[in-house]
A protein has these predicted regions:
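Conserved donor NDP-sugar-binding/catalytic core segment of glycosyltransferases
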Residues: 1-28, 97
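Short glycine/serine/threonine-enriched helix-capping/active-site loop
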Residues: 5-8, 101-102, 109
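Small-residue-rich loop/turn and linker elements
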Residues: 9, 113-114
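Activation segment
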Residues: 13, 71-72, 110
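C-terminal, non-catalytic tails of nucleotide-sugar-dependent glycosyltransferases
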Residues: 13-14, 25-53, 57, 62, ...
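Histidine-centered active-site/metal-ligand motif
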Residues: 31, 108-109
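A short, conserved alpha-helix in the catalytic core of glycosyltransferases
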Residues: 45-72, 77-105
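Active-site mouth of glycoside hydrolases
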Residues: 109-110, 119
Length: 165
C-alpha cells in the first residue's frame, strides 16, 4: 500500500527544509514545517513519527521500480517544478499512500546549484516555472485544494494554523 517514501530534510543550520508536502498551500503545494527546529515534534507530533502526506519531495524519494512504471514515472513536461507533486498524486490515484519517515534525516542544500526560479521575472527559469505551475494546476485542479491528509479547517496560507475571520 506504500507508494513514495520520503525523509526529513534539514538545512545546514539544523532547521527543517522538508517533512512532507501539503497540497493547496501557496497556491499549489508547499513543504511543511519549514524552518522548525530539528528536534521540534511538530503539529500533533507529526515531526516525530512516520506520517502520510499527499506528496514528498523528489529531493529524497524512494519508490519501487514496479510502482514507478505503473504510473508512467515522472512527467517530462515538468522539468523542475512540481514533478514530484505530480508523481505522488499519480501514486495516490492508484491507491497508494505516500509517507515521510521523519526519523530518517538528511541535510539538503535546497536549490544551491540551480538557484531560485522565481526571483528574476524576466528570466527563462521564471517563464518555465509559470508554465509548470499552470500545467499542474490544469492537470490536478480541485485535488490541489482537497488534501486528504490535511485538516480542511486549517489555513491554506500557512500550514497548521487557523485563518482569522
Amino acid at each position: 500500500h506504500i507508494g513514495a517514501v520520503g525523509a526529513k530534510l534539514l538545512y545546514p543550520d539544523n532547521t527543517v527544509q522538508h517533512a512532507g508536502i501539503i497540497l493547496g498551500i501557496g497556491g499549489i503545494a508547499q513543504h511543511c514545517f519549514i524552518d522548525n527546529p530539528r528536534d521540534d515534534v511538530g503539529f500533533y507530533g507529526r515531526l516525530s513519527v512516520p506520517f502520510n502526506y499527499s506528496a514528498v519531495t523528489a529531493a529524497c524519494l524512494m519508490v519501487s521500480k514496479e510502482k514507478y512504471l505503473e504510473v508512467n514515472g515522472l512527467e517530462e513536461d515538468l522539468q523542475v517544478a512540481f514533478n514530484d507533486v505530480d508523481f505522488n498524486l499519480k501514486l495516490l490515484k492508484q491507491g497508494y499512500y505516500n509517507i515521510c519517515l521523519n526519523h530518517v534525516e538528511l541535510y539538503h542544500h535546497e536549490s544551491k546549484s540551480r538557484g531560485d526560479d522565481t526571483v528574476d521575472t524576466s528570466s527563462a527559469k521564471y517563464r518555465r516555472f509559470v508554465q509548470e505551475h499552470d500545467y499542474i494546476k490544469d492537470k490536478w485542479g480541485y485535488m490541489l485544494y482537497t488534501d486528504r491528509f490535511y485538516n480542511p479547517n486549517l489555513s491554506l496560507k500557512k500550514a497548521f494554523v487557523l485563518d482569522k475571520e
